[in-house]
């Protein structure tokens, strides 16, 4: 089987799907390759990003949390995007591709509900029918986002099978698509899954890093020492990293969720603590039991609660171009509180993992002069009840 683009990043990636889905993936790849060369498509995408989503997003210098250190810290404000997170960028691109292929329906999966909301808003805007699979447990945990999706006309389908979380929603969405791909486009929510999705999602998120590079050069006259982003599937991180990969002076740091601590097994850090296997249509590191079953991942943040990781991150890790670390629930929560109290910004719990690592770098070497950028991938409105319940249980409020 030949593809137009390389389906692998080193040994990672590929197209491990039932034969019935190969024509749909090939059609998607063809549409993407032709759209990338089509000035009309690019102009339409750029217009939506600017006038609907609100790009470019700001690069904000932290005023207070760096006090007592020689660190300069900037936040790339994807939280200011319409929809509240970076997810909006690539769904607009995929929805335009769906229209280009003559599809009338969108199928999506969602965990925290952010990708579901983004899929629903893009579908409403472009006149596409939308159905979203969501683990029954997540439907309960994320009721405001479920209501947002329904307000925008999407059908939300709770999935009760398995653990009733994101991985089960992914399985159901793929099952649906294999029977409906002639009329439906599967709007995958992260830079993972079968080729060509990891490449498409990266290209539709790469403006994060492109804007950051131009903005930091304008503000500081040089490139940052490191860019830092949280990694679940890895779309916000690859969007930030892509334009810096060839700038070898810039450190790329991905932050996986350490949950209750790596040693407890209750985490979501397959890159550093998983084994390579086949899942969700790709070859990548994943959390597995001793007999090779997919193990439940865990994080305080539903959006990082994914048992595998995008293949390009696996490749960047394997060649040593990017460093991947983990941050626990407690560390992320502390960073969340710090940003709220000292900068007046409420970050998503996902993004708080990246911020926590930047704070750690700063505090461990206060005398080190360093220029850091954290990708603030989303806003924390969706997380305030989770945080409230934890702080209440601890007697902090």
Curated annotation (Swiss-Prot):
Residue numbers carrying N6-(pyridoxal phosphate)lysine: 87
The UniProt record lists the keyword ATP-binding: no
Biochemical pathway: Amino-acid biosynthesis; L-tryptophan biosynthesis; L-tryptophan from chorismate: step 5/5
UniProt enzyme class: lyase
Keyword line: Amino-acid biosynthesis, Aromatic amino acid biosynthesis, Lyase, Pyridoxal phosphate, Tryptophan biosynthesis
Cross-referenced PANTHER family: TRYPTOPHAN SYNTHASE, TRYPTOPHAN SYNTHASE-RELATED
SUPFAM superfamilies recorded: Tryptophan synthase beta subunit-like PLP-dependent enzymes
InterPro entries xref list: Trp_synth_b_CS, Trp_synth_beta, Trp_synth_beta/beta-like, TrpB-like_PALP, TrpB-like_PALP_sf
Organism, as annotated: Salmonella choleraesuis (strain SC-B67)
Gene of this entry: trpB
MF terms in GO: tryptophan synthase activity
Top-level taxonomy: Bacteria, Pseudomonadati, Pseudomonadota, Gammaproteobacteria, Enterobacterales
Assembly mode: Tetramer of two alpha and two beta chains.
Keyword Lyase: yes
Assigned EC number: 4.2.1.20
Protein name (database record): Tryptophan synthase beta chain
């Amino acid at each position: 089987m030949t593809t137009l683009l390389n389906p692998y990043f080193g040994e990672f990636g590929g197209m491990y799907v039932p034969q019935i889905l190969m024509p749909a993936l090939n059609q998607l790849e063809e549409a993407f390759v032709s759209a990338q060369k089509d000035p009309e498509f690019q102009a339409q995408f750029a217009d939506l990003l600017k006038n609907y989503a609100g790009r470019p997003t700001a690069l904000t210098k932290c005023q207070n949390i760096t006090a007592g250190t020689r660190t300069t810290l900037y936040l790339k404000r994807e939280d200011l995007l319409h929809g509240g997170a970076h997810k909006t960028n690539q769904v607009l691109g995929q929805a335009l591709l769906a229209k280009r292929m003559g599809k009338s329906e969108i199928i999506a999966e969602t965990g925290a509900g952010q990708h579901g909301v983004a899929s629903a808003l893009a579908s409403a805007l472009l006149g596409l029918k939308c159905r979203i699979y969501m683990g029954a447990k997540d439907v309960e945990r994320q009721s405001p986002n479920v209501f947002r999706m329904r307000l925008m006309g999407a059908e939300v389908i709770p999935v009760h099978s398995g653990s009733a979380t994101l991985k089960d929603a992914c399985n159901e969405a793929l099952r649906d698509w294999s029977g409906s791909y002639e009329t439906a486009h599967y709007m995958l929510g992260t830079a993972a899954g079968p080729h060509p999705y990891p490449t498409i999602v990266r290209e539709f998120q790469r403006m994060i890093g492109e804007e950051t590079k131009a903005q930091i050069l304008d503000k500081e006259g040089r490139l940052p020492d490191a860019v830092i982003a949280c990694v679940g599937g890895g779309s916000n991180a690859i969007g930030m990293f892509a334009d810096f990969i060839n700038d070898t002076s810039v450190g790329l740091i991905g932050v996986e969720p350490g949950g209750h601590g790596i040693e407890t097994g209750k985490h979501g850090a397959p890159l550093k603590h998983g084994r390579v296997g086949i899942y969700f249509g790709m070859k990548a590191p994943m959390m597995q039991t001793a007999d090779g079953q997919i193990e439940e991942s865990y994080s305080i943040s539903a959006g990082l609660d994914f048992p595998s990781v995008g293949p390009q991150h696996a490749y960047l890790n394997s060649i040593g171009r990017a460093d991947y670390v983990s941050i626990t629930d407690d560390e992320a929560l502390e960073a969340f509180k710090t940003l709220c109290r000292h900068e007046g910004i409420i970050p998503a719990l996902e993004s708080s993992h990246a911020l926590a690592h930047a704070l750690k770098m700063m505090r461990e070497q206060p005398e080190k002069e360093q220029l850091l950028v954290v990708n603030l991938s989303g806003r924390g409105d969706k997380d305030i009840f989770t945080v409230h319940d934890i702080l209440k249980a601890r007697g902090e409020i």
